[in-house]
Amino acid sequence: MSAFGSQSMAATLRRVLMRSAANAMRDADRSAWHYGPGFNPAKAASQHAALAELVAASGAEIEWIEDKADGLSDSVFTHDPSLMTSRGALILSMGKPLRAREPSLHEETYTRLGIPILGRVEAPGQVEGGDCVWVDTRTLAIGRGVRSNQDGIQQVSNLLTPLGISVYGFDLPLWQGEEACLHLMSVISPLADDLALVYSPLLPAPFYQMLKARGIRLVEGDAGEFASSNGLSLNVLPTSPLKVIAVAGFPKTKAAMEAAGCMVEVFEADALCIACEGGPTCLTRPILRQ
């Protein structure tokens, strides 16, 4: 079994990169990090540990970035600073200035794990992992918005095109402003290779058309739950096709996934995901899916 490679959003999760919230978030300034009033460092750490237990119970091996009080509170959201391919890791470039040091944490960890670095997105280019969606193993969609720009998308394309991978950029709306980040993955969560949970009013129209043309079935997330959660109701992590982990408290969206054939596990995440604007997908960087 290969030790790395993840060009699918929903194939069985075998190996994943995470970072504990125990120290990273302990002294976080809620205002500086744009966290909501429900943020509580100790409770967030406990909820993160509960997520890690679910991930491990699925059979995935968790690789941990060193947990220390380095002031990088958002570094628990490991999905964003890197992207994994069958040829190695892409080290990305963050659109949020407070997160600028995080890609180096990923590069150091991959080096320790013996995973090759395929390339890097360099400033002024910006791409965050939350804007990257594998439509299939040869097609990568990237949302162009406040966190990922055309320069960064072009750099990713330059790195992946020689591998036979097509990269497409899709414009995202501003939605609630620059600080309240809207990633492409804020409006789509693949549940299987041919099934995705979406909030279609915010989907880029050409991306929606691409999904439909490729026969991907779309499950609509509940609009009220999407609004009340600032999109976190839609952020679900597939541990294998049709088996997902979601934030508790959104029964209509959970029922929609179950009606489409999914098994849904939930965890309490009010102090972590809701308060800090990042769900179970954001808290994990798949290293190996197969």
Give residue spans per PLM region.
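The feature marks the mature, well-folded catalytic cores of soluble enzymes
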Residues: 1-290
